[in-house]
């Protein structure tokens, strides 16, 4: 009996120290590993006492304590294990894990080890991106685009209708005057015979044309109503930064015998400076700087470009001065010229090789009041300016230069033509040389493409004879020049 007590005493001490050992053992391994996989032969020396009730304690391991929170007191007679608050929390956590596993169906997860505390839910709940949510903030780009498109369409309709109303208001106020001075008003050019339509011809949403003809000393008169691009939203926004005004341009083409040879222009300072640089006739025949018209009683805002002083004295009579003084704010430019060819023609290769075609023309440009905020009543205020156009046609027909003025005008035109020929002489020589080289190249290609050798030889001999004759002619000319020089 005494020997049995000595055998049981070491076993009891080992069992008391087992919880601490198992806690450290479980910490060294992952939770998913099964502790039962390890061999129990380490405790084979205690198999003889398997009938002892203490062995049952080994089969049912106590709760796993925290290593730092479970003090162990070794004593020869007894051992006590105290659980602190941390142990209770650990046991509560295990209970929560167990409750989570109980939610699953036992039949579906048959054979699954419920004691595995390392199981975690692998489902990942991702948040929906903000741009995929169904809210108005997700469509702000589409809303802006639709709003801009609607604004453009509304502005197009409103601007087009306003230009149409302004054009119709101008025509209604000027129709009686035009029909009393011209036999044909409003020919659209669609029919072979000239017919009076009595209405404006719309070129686009902001330009309207009116052709009039059938008057003494006048081939025809083209009136262009150049309104602002009110139908274009971008143009409307640009005009907020830089306001502009509508314009009415009148171009009268006279017969050759109904106008003398002179060039004259009057208008605002800015317009005269620009036209002198851009217009072909003003840059050639009016080389002097624009002069003030204070001598004739016109406002300082208007300047004059004239080929001769005699022309200015003849044009600026009392009635013409009255028109210019009363409507100086509406007059952009007035241009009379027998050499009118439009703006300068700039070619890529240089000066044009031919003088531009000229016509005797009267050109008027008027500004519509309002600076863009034009009303139909403002179009009625342009009627006196149309009376000035009719008066200018009759005035130019009656204006004739004296003998000295006529000779000076002819010398000016001869000088301009001579300067033009000098400027284009080198270009004409280069063009002639290029044509000769192209002709020779074409002749050589024709000879080389000839299949008959005999015919090819005859063509080469004929080409050589032509070249020889040309050389002989040049030599004869050189001899004649030397003889004349002697």
From Swiss-Prot:
Signal sequence annotation: 1-23
Q: Which InterPro entries match?
A: CCDC47 (IPR012879)
The membrane-topology field of this record reads: Single-pass type I membrane protein
**Similarity remark:** Belongs to the CCDC47 family.
Spell out the GO cellular component terms annotated for this protein, sorted alphabetically and separated by semicolons.
Answer: endoplasmic reticulum; endoplasmic reticulum membrane; multi-pass translocon complex; rough endoplasmic reticulum membrane
The record places the following residue ranges in the Cytoplasmic compartment, namely 24-138
What is this protein called in UniProt? PAT complex subunit CCDC47
Q: Give the compositionally biased regions (Acidic residues).
A: 72-97
Superkingdom, according to UniProt? Eukaryota
Supply the alphabetized keyword list. Coiled coil, Endoplasmic reticulum, Membrane, Signal, Transmembrane, Transmembrane helix
Role summary: Component of the multi-pass translocon (MPT) complex that mediates insertion of multi-pass membrane proteins into the lipid bilayer of membranes. The MPT complex takes over after the SEC61 complex: following membrane insertion of the first few transmembrane segments of proteins by the SEC61 complex, the MPT complex occludes the lateral gate of the SEC61 complex to promote insertion of subsequent transmembrane regions.
What are the Basic and acidic residues biased-composition ranges?
A: 433-475
Q: Where are the transmembrane segments?
A: 139-159
- Basic residues compositional bias, start-end: 476-486
Record carries keyword Signal: yes
Q: Which organism is it from?
A: Danio rerio (Zebrafish)
Question: Which GO BP terms sit in this record?
Answer: endoplasmic reticulum calcium ion homeostasis; multi-pass transmembrane protein insertion into ER membrane; protein insertion into ER membrane
